[in-house]
Amino acid sequence: MGRLFGTDGVRGVANRELTPELVLALGAAAARCLANSGEPGRRVAVIGRDPRASGEMLEAAVIAGLTSAGVDALRVGVLPTPAVAYLTGAYDADFGVMISASHNPMVDNGIKIFGPGGHKLDDDTEDQIEDLVTGGPGLRPAGVAIGRVIDAEDATERYLRHVGKASTIRLDGLTVVVDCAHGAASSAAPRAYRAAGARVIAINADPNGININDRCGSTDLGSLRSAVLAHRADLGLAHDGDADRCLAVDANGDLVDGDAIMVVLALAMQEAGELSSNTLVTTVMSNLGLHLAMRSVGVIVRTTDVGDRYVLEELRAGDFSLGGEQSGHIVMPALGSTGDGIITGLRLMTRMVQTSSSLAALASAMRALPQVLINVEVADKTTAAAAPLVQTAVETAEVELGNTGRILLRPSGTEPMIRVMVEAAEEDVAHRVATRVAAAVSAQGSPLRCWNPDAISGVELRL
């Protein structure tokens, strides 16, 4: 059995890989690991979920695991992942559990666990939980020591008050289209943006348990682009299923990705004296254009492996104030312990109003090099990445790109796929090189399918 935890919790096909039995064991193990220290008294865990159909089943399983280990379950219902992280600290809970597979299809689900204060767990703590899962349930309490279930009636309002602090000025006069991905932010995001003064047009905000992330949200911007143009909006914001991401499109429908958002926010924070150590933290996936834009204004860029958890670790280690990923995970520790798509949207709109600038004008501070990202589904990520044919294709690509571009090949931490990313001075070169390397990856093992780029464009590449 491989490691249970990936880069963003435990994920799998609900009821097949992520079974109620496994989730019950995870809940009990988390309770035993995270709720056995501190002063005597009742132990409490916050539990939330996104609206996908399997969430109700898995919520029941998590609650059974928690309460069977003597921990009270404080149920907050359908809310974004960053809401669960925030509420874990706000309620002074021992830990928090979010049931979500983020941007994944509805057939999947996942378990994310937050430690005290709403911080993501480190590898050692995850390993301890895994050991407890495989070691059995341990001694179970009885009688009054069994955990209880409590519904947190004020959870949504508490969270909305929290995110409202991200907008320091009124957004009156700004029109925004928000694509909620039929996900956890379908209610919270429009409410937060309206409370800040913006005119809000919400789309894909009618979750039925089945339609989450279905041709909408941050993984498919087609409907957002159309709505922005149709309503002549100032911008569009797209969240994923659990709203820890935010991507944007400008008034022309052009993408403003996480890299460009980070550049906009870094410049704003630098101007306000809030960019700690004049440093931005991002991952190896960020476009070279981000590095060039930051270098031109004297901002230091620190790079981590892919995954917001690694960005968070670097932010905490260096006491930095801004970090994120190209995919739209943006983290500002002063405003939350993890990435929050709604807060990102509010800060972006605040900058537009402060400077009386269009989003396109703000985003022009960064000139992105042509980048092609191809996701190749494979049966075995490790074997495919290490295959001689693939390594040869990568080496050939590196020679062709020279010092005017780069190639990055990495297994996904949350899905059965390998990501092929190529940047080059010319778009046709990037496409040609990426397609050739992706074909080599696809030829390994039992190839399933290939598409480009992280579903943002929705354009499939036939290899």
UniProtKB/Swiss-Prot annotation:
Enzyme Commission number(s) of this protein: 5.4.2.10
A cellular-component GO term for this protein: cytosol
Reaction it catalyzes: alpha-D-glucosamine 1-phosphate = D-glucosamine 6-phosphate
Residues the record lists as binding Mg(2+): 102, 240, 242, 244
Entries under InterPro entries matching the protein: A-D-PHexomutase_a/b/a-I, A-D-PHexomutase_a/b/a-I/II/III, A-D-PHexomutase_a/b/a-II, A-D-PHexomutase_a/b/a-III, A-D-PHexomutase_C, A-D-PHexomutase_C_sf, A-D-PHexomutase_CS, Alpha-D-phosphohexomutase_SF
SUPFAM superfamilies attached to this UniProt entry: Phosphoglucomutase, C-terminal domain (SSF55957), Phosphoglucomutase, first 3 domains (SSF53738)
Active site location: 102
Keyword S-adenosyl-L-methionine: no
Enzyme class, broadest EC rank: isomerase
GO biological process: carbohydrate metabolic process; peptidoglycan biosynthetic process; UDP-N-acetylglucosamine biosynthetic process
Modified residue annotations for Phosphoserine: 102
Co-factor binding comment: Binds 1 Mg(2+) ion per subunit.
UniProt keywords, alphabetically: Isomerase, Magnesium, Metal-binding, Phosphoprotein
Transmembrane segments: none
Swiss-Prot/TrEMBL cofactor(s): Mg(2+)
A molecular-function term among this protein's GO annotations: magnesium ion binding
Post-translational modification summary for this protein: Activated by phosphorylation.
Family of this protein: Belongs to the phosphohexose mutase family.
Function, as annotated: Catalyzes the conversion of glucosamine-6-phosphate to glucosamine-1-phosphate.
Protein name from the UniProt record: Phosphoglucosamine mutase
Source organism of the structure: Mycobacterium leprae (strain TN)
Organism lineage: Bacteria, Bacillati, Actinomycetota, Actinomycetes, Mycobacteriales
